[in-house]
Amino acid sequence: MEDIKSLIAGVDEVGKGCLFGPVFAAAVILSKKNEIELLNQGLKDSKKLSQRQRHNLVPLIKTNSIAWTIGQASAREIDVMGIRDATEKAMLRALEKFSSPPDLILVDGILPIRLWPGKQKTQVRGESHFASIAAASVLAKETRDELIKRLARKYNCYGLEKNKGYGTEIHRTKLIKEGATKLHRKSFISRLKKN
């Protein structure tokens, strides 16, 4: 049994730049032993993995982590509070689901979570430096993509099953032709119309 002296959670988000749907965040706590196991199984930055590789890693991350959580902030929350605050809200929601707060959080990027009361460290391209952030990036991406796939059946004219809510040319063209749904980020779309 590994002696765990402190709980360190990696935190990452996905979907910040999308026109559709919530922003998701995940937080993952790994032991050193399980970090090595997951890295040996191919864990790395979710952007460097295929969809199949990410999908296969999800159960491994869930079973090999000490704890993992998911948080999200809706398109409406993004419109009301802005993407930075909504992203932080999603991260806080994930972190607050842990039964006890981690001793340290590792946040992907340069911006700390302003309302987090505990210790934190930011790291640009954190998913390339810390296995726990890489694991969080995979969980957040796969969880959000699964939701968008389900929503694509209901909102089938926007190409969501392929673009996952990002502002591809097809998505933008359909927005002009069909209009926005209640799950589109109105603040993002209004910026598109100005350009």
Swiss-Prot record:
It is found in: Cytoplasm. The gene is rnhB. The keyword Manganese applies. This is Ribonuclease HII. Its EC number is 3.1.26.4. GO terms for molecular function: manganese ion binding; RNA binding; RNA-DNA hybrid ribonuclease activity. Residues 6-195 form the RNase H type-2 domain. PANTHER family: RIBONUCLEASE H2 SUBUNIT A, RIBONUCLEASE HII. PROSITE patterns: RNASE_H_2. It holds the Pfam family RNase_HII. HAMAP family: RNase_HII_B (MF_00052_B). One of its GO terms (cellular component) is ribonuclease H2 complex. A divalent metal cation binds at D12, E13, D108. It catalyses: Endonucleolytic cleavage to 5'-phosphomonoester. InterPro entries: RNase_HII, RNase_HII/HIII, RNase_HII/HIII_dom, RNaseH-like_sf, RNaseH_sf. Belongs to the RNase HII family.
